[in-house]
Regions:
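Generic structural signal for short, solvent-exposed loop/turn connectors between secondary structure elements
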Residues: 1, 24-25, 44, 69
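Short N-terminal binding/cap micro-motifs at the start of the first secondary-structure element
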Residues: 13-15, 36-39
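N-terminal Rossmann-like FAD-binding beta1-loop-alpha1 element of flavoenzymes
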Residues: 2-29
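Conserved N-terminal/central alpha/beta ligand/cofactor-binding core
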Residues: 32, 38-107
Length: 107
């Protein structure tokens, strides 16, 4: 079994941990803050706004400045992909006003 250490328990670090564990790795996540993923918990007025379910071009258009620089990255791993990943790992989601995606649990 492979052993993987991930530095940082933010959204990217936690998702990297899920991905590595899915492939059978033993994962350790090292986070300097007391609670991993804490910034995610404060998005959407404390309800964990995960993503936006709108069309990718609309999302890019609404990014301040030049959102087009994110075009290739978002096409590689889209808003639909993150929702699918989370739901495949047991997190039910819901879409609310403005196409905002939240966990059904609101946390």
């Amino acid at each position: 079994m492979s052993k993987v250490i991930i530095i940082g328990g933010g959204a990217a670090g936690l998702l990297a941990g899920i991905a590595a564990a899915t492939y059978g790795a033993e994962v350790t996540i090292i986070e300097k803050m007391r609670v991993p993923g804490k910034k995610m918990l404060i998005t959407g007025k404390g309800r964990c706004n995960i993503t936006n379910a709108g069309e990718l071009q609309d999302i890019i258009k609404n990014i301040p400045g030049n959102g087009r620089f994110l075009n290739s990255a978002l096409r590689q791993f889209s808003n639909d992909d993150i929702v699918c990943l989370l739901e495949c790992n047991g997190l039910e989601t819901k879409v609310e006003r403005g196409n905002r995606v939240f966990p059904v649990s609101d946390k």
